[in-house]
């Protein structure tokens, strides 16, 4: 069996949930004529391929972390394709959850990079400093995402990608999400490892 089939057979609920929200938000994007849909779908396919590779090479990735990744994907698709319920912006990413302080955009970036930090720390669990590796690699994921979005925005009219200030806030929330994940794993352990329930880790991976 291929690595993708192995992963799908191991986590059918996550696969169905992912298929469901991808289908829903694809329809939403088509109905609303959101051109960025044709950027999101290939990016999502590439992201799934990376997850499958990590699962095959360093897995199996714990199901709870796969759920977090799927939820992040759904939040991201909703943010770029669904409308802002307040009517102030064209897409959900512009929706202020707490006026002047927290937008949907901030929440998605923080949650997503936090989830990526946990997955990458799990992948680096056999290294001397898994939490540091998870933190650093997750920031790389964030930078790649921001770079790709801004490059594509140069060629896609009406992409709704923000300006430099928005990008700076995205990076700040990447740091916040990763720090929250690292602090949580410092106290509770890396999910899916032998210390995930039985002990805590310091930043260098030593048992406390």
Regions found by a protein language model. Give the residues of each.
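Bulky hydrophobic segments
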Residues: 1-161, 183-208
């Amino acid at each position: 069996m291929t690595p993708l089939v192995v992963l799908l057979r191991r986590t059918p609920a996550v696969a169905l949930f992912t298929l469901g929200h991808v289908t829903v938000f694809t329809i939403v994007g088509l109905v609303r004529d959101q051109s960025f849909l044709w950027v999101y779908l290939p990016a999502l396919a590439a992201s799934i391929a990376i997850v499958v590779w990590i699962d095959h090479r360093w897995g199996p990735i714990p199901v709870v972390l796969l759920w977090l990744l799927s939820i992040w994907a759904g939040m991201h698709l909703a943010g770029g394709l669904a409308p802002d319920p307040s009517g102030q912006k064209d897409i959900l990413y512009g929706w202020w959850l707490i006026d002047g302080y927290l937008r949907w955009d901030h929440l998605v970036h923080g949650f997503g990079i936090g989830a990526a930090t946990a997955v990458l720390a799990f992948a680096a669990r056999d290294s001397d400093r898994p939490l540091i590796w998870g933190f650093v690699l997750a920031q790389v994921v964030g930078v790649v995402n921001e770079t790709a979005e801004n490059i594509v925005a140069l060629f896609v009219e009406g992409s709704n990608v923000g300006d430099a200030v928005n990008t700076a806030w995205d990076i700040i929330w990447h740091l916040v999400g990763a720090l929250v994940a690292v602090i949580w794993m410092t106290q509770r352990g890396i999910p899916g490892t032998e210390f995930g329930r039985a002990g805590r880790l310091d930043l260098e991976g030593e048992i406390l």
